Amino acid sequence: MFLGKITKRVMTKGRIILLVLAVAVIAELAAQEHTDTLRTKALPEVEVEARRVIRQGTTDSYFPSKAQRERSANAFSLLGNLHLPGIVVDQVERTLNYTRGGGRVALEINGKPSNIDELLSLPVSRLKKVQLVRVPSVKYGTDVAVVINVVAGRGDSGVGLGLNAMNALTTNYNDDALWFRFNTGVHELGVNYNFKLNGIDKAFTRTNEHINNPTGLMVNRKIDGRFSGGNYRDDFLSLYYTLNRTNRRTIDVRTSLDWDRFPQRAIDATVDDGSSYTMRTLNESDERQLGLKVYYEERFSARNVLNVWLAANAFANKYQRGFSSPTANKHYDVDGKKQSARLETEFSHTFSPACKLAVGWQQSLAHTSNTYVSLQNTNFNYDDNSQYAFAQACGSLGKLTYSLGMGYARDAVWQRGKGFEHYAWRPKFYVQYAFNDIWQIDYNLSSTTSLPSLAQMTAYERQDDDQRTTMGNPSLRPFTTYRHWLSLNANKGIFSFMAFGMYEYNHGSIVDMLAITPMGTVQQSWTNDGQYKHLEIGIYCGLNLLGEHLQVYAEPKYVTFISRATLRHNRSNFCLQLGASGWVKKWGFNGYFRTAMESMEGDMLEHRTGTSDVNVNYAFRNVHVKLGWRNLFSCEGPATRKILETTNARYETVQGNLGFANMVYVGLSWSFFKGKQTKRRKESRQVDASFDSGIVK
């Protein structure tokens, strides 16, 4: 009977959603009655060449200039030279981060899920444009803030190979990659290999504790920790095959092996609580991951497209942890295994250049087994089963552009016969009004669902130090966050401008909890007692000067948090980002500066110190050399400070790496190609627009 009520309610809401989508499509068809459907004229070539950024609905298309292409070693370095608003392209650590609220950056190549390793091996000559999807469709789920889609042409026939090296001169930091490909024009075979070797001897951790124990006595402790031991190493090997029949069919098959390991390392901490003694924590990990990804795209016609993506992963993780002090000694091993798979399908139909309807289905399965080996072995098994269905329609009515999407998700997690099933609607609404060719205003409404991690749900007590333990909470439940976004945008010649505001809130969020035991020790866990409000207001300004040989941008913003768990917290701060890049003949430079940023959840405040980077690069044919200086005049480099303040305790922990303070690094990119290069005409038309690995904890 209960399932019947749920089914009836779901079907009723589903009919309403489908009716709304149908009305939107019919309205669009009426508005397009006098157009020539897919044969509508493209923008004149002169206009596209004059405007490097073209906004169309939720997507901004960036057309790289000749100077930007010549000074970019690969597609990833080109992303950095484009200065995409709200995106931080870290050329040293090779990451993409979003600076406006939460969420990650999803990366695609020609609409196919991709990663940075693939961008490092993608020649700039194949790149047509970069699309920044500011409002991702409902198919991307809950944690994607923006999507970067690199539109590339088919590869040249022949053999190519290349090297991308990033190495520090002042500390032990190495991130190097090799790639090889053989292309016949339609078929392509390739190999990517990435090697990382990083030292830990300059890493540090510091903690200040203030605890009110049950007797009313305030206990203060200072802990100063230093790392020693083996270096972190990661080897990643990927083999792939791609079939690309232009405008008809694409098949991409990739298999990968990732070996991530950390030889035994020690954290030696000096404790000062009136007396002085030493604690030692030993850690060792060895994780191997085998992955398979298959992407299939079929263009039945210019109007109808089917996309299918299948991913499967197998993990094996061995983790050892030991702790010792004058009053406590505990050691355990974790033998973890995980098998997971994910299937995504999407079918889209284009009614006109401005009207499109997409529907899809996603299914994911995972099984995790963690065995804690100690005096008494303890086993935890987890089973995840999730389904997600979605539909989205987008179109335009005169100067008004809209996108209406709805998804319905079922998430189920089970451990030891207990767990939860969570059902959630995920609406997404977007509307844009264009005052003219220069000014537009956007509004976006969306909701996301956050699930508890396996570590947060594992009821195994871990000894952090002689006074503190951590234990998961199997009763945790998902929670929903609602977000409103409003922006005013302008693009005119050399000038780009955006004024934006973002407000998000949730109830019942997962937050840290501290409990004081009768013995005066502290146990950390998690609860669903959080409430959260987050507001951001900012401005972005960008300029292209000296015939696009100099680019500068600035983004100041004001951020405020109101968070409640055991206490009510109100925190505000001002953030500023500045950046510039320029070219003179074969020489170029890049630089950026970011002030400190903060975020808050429950009673936990996270403060990330500011960072800076400046580098000079030289390009000669297929060789690009870069010399850089990171975190100038910084004493400790980038560090993260976490402050957890409750009614009976206050913890302040700082973690960082001195190796990234005043770090001097050198980068080298080289590529070689032998074969027949295809002549490519200039792009003169607009082209319309996770797999969660679940590392064993």
What are these regions (language model features)?
Residues 111-137, 178-180, 239:
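Short acidic/polar hinge/loop motifs at secondary-structure boundaries
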Residues 45-47, 75-80, 94-97, 117, ...:
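N-terminal periplasmic accessory domains that precede
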Residues 76-112:
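Extracytoplasmic beta-strand/coil segments of soluble accessory domains associated
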Residues 33-68, 92-93:
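Short, acidic, small-residue-rich periplasmic hinge/interaction motif at the N-terminus
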Residues 165-169, 184, 195-199, 257-263, ...:
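Transmembrane beta-strands of outer-membrane beta-barrel pores
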